[in-house]
């Protein structure tokens, strides 16, 4: 079995389910699906897709930085949104966090684990060794 390192940023809350915020294996960082939760797993920025997107990307940034990387190391994002009406607001914030070369990604509409959550993002990054 390939050695892996569990990545949990300092001050993180306890996940709702049995998973880690991030896993690093062989230079590849996998960031779990991330929602706009506070440390008690309450949704923040209710009704605000841009605010939730910013919160999610800041959380992902924290996980990757804890492992020694940066958002520039992200190669793929999986984006889940509850309604296409939020697509423009999400993309506006997303572009602020990825101003240069953009990672590959997909975006689908679906239900999320909490009704007030509007967006979830999972990421893959390749960290420098």
UniProtKB/Swiss-Prot annotation:
GO biological process, one term: uracil catabolic process
Transmembrane segments: none
Record SUPFAM superfamilies: YjgF-like
Lineage of source species: Bacteria, Pseudomonadati, Pseudomonadota, Gammaproteobacteria, Enterobacterales
Keyword DNA damage among record annotations: no
Protein name: 3-aminoacrylate deaminase RutC
Catalysed reactions listed for this entry: (Z)-3-aminoacrylate + H2O + H(+) = 3-oxopropanoate + NH4(+)
Function: Involved in pyrimidine catabolism. Catalyzes the deamination of 3-aminoacrylate to malonic semialdehyde, a reaction that can also occur spontaneously. RutC may facilitate the reaction and modulate the metabolic fitness, rather than catalyzing essential functions.
EC class (word): hydrolase
EC code(s) of this entry: 3.5.-.-
Protein family membership: Belongs to the RutC family.
Single GO MF descriptor: deaminase activity
A Pfam short name: Ribonuc_L-PSP
Keywords tagged on the record: Hydrolase
Sections of the chain in a coiled coil: none
UniProt GO cellular component terms: cytosol
Keyword Ion transport recorded: no
Top-rank taxon, per record: Bacteria
NCBIfam families per the UniProt record, alphabetical: RutC
């Amino acid at each position: 079995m390939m050695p892996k390192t569990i990545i949990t940023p300092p001050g993180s809350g306890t996940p709702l389910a049995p998973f880690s915020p991030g896993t690093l294996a062989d230079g590849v960082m996998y960031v779990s699906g991330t929602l706009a939760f506070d440390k008690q797993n309450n949704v923040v920025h209710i009704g605000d897709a841009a605010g939730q997107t910013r919160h999610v990307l800041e959380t992902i940034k924290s996980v990757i930085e804890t492992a020694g990387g940066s958002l520039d190391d992200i190669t793929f994002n999986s984006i889940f949104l509850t309604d296409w009406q939020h697509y423009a607001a999400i993309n506006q914030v997303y572009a602020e966090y990825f101003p240069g070369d953009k990672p590959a990604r997909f975006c689908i509409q679906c239900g999320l684990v909490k009704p007030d959550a509007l967006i979830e993002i999972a990421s893959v990054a390749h960290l420098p060794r």
